[in-house]
Amino acid sequence: MTYVMVTGPMGAGKSTFMRSLPKPWNDFIIPKNVPDMLLDYACSLKNLMFYEIDAPTATGKVWINWLKVADIQVVIANGKENPDANFIELWDYLEKNTPNIKKIIILNRTKKISEQWSTYNDNEIFCIGIGKTINEETALASKNDIRAVLDYLNSNYE
């Protein structure tokens, strides 16, 4: 099993990413040695165990084992914007506390990696466009873009 933590600043699109993962979802298996936590979204797809933790929770000391149990950390950001203080704080925290865990960045709401994100070019970066708007607060990401991320994860971490 490969644990994939999905995190990012509030409003970056974590839930949109999780909601956009193809169905059917299988049951999430809670990793060993982590505290009880109510996860907004958690599911398994084949051997990939996805779970979502928002940035304020991820940087809380009590949840550090949830960060450390991940085999890969997917950090979602608003790709229309520059890396903001919330993203930078989260990224720096993850780098400091989980330096040996592979990280990928997903720039949400865009199809192009802007120059402002070049600081992070040592990491795999994906762009995810909006696929379908359900209502003013809910959307689904582009199926093709989600598939590209899943293909990458399956070929590198399964």
Pin down the residues of each PLM region.
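Conserved G1/Walker A P-loop phosphate-binding module
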Residues: M1-N33
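Conserved C-terminal guanine-recognition region of P-loop GTPase G domains, centered on the G4
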Residues: Q73, G79-N123
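Conserved catalytic network of the ASCE P-loop NTPase/AAA+ motor domain
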Residues: A42-K46, N65-A70, E95-P99
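Switch II (G3) loop of P-loop NTPases
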Residues: K46-W63
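Canonical P-loop GTPase G-domain recognition
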Residues: K112-E158
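Inter-motif core of Ras-like GTPase G domains
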Residues: G60-E81
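Conserved substrate/cofactor phosphate-moiety recognition/catalytic segment
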Residues: W25-L45, F50
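Short acidic, S/G/P-rich loop/turn micro-motifs used as interaction or catalytic elements
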Residues: A12-G13, P56-T59, G79-D84, T110-I113, ...
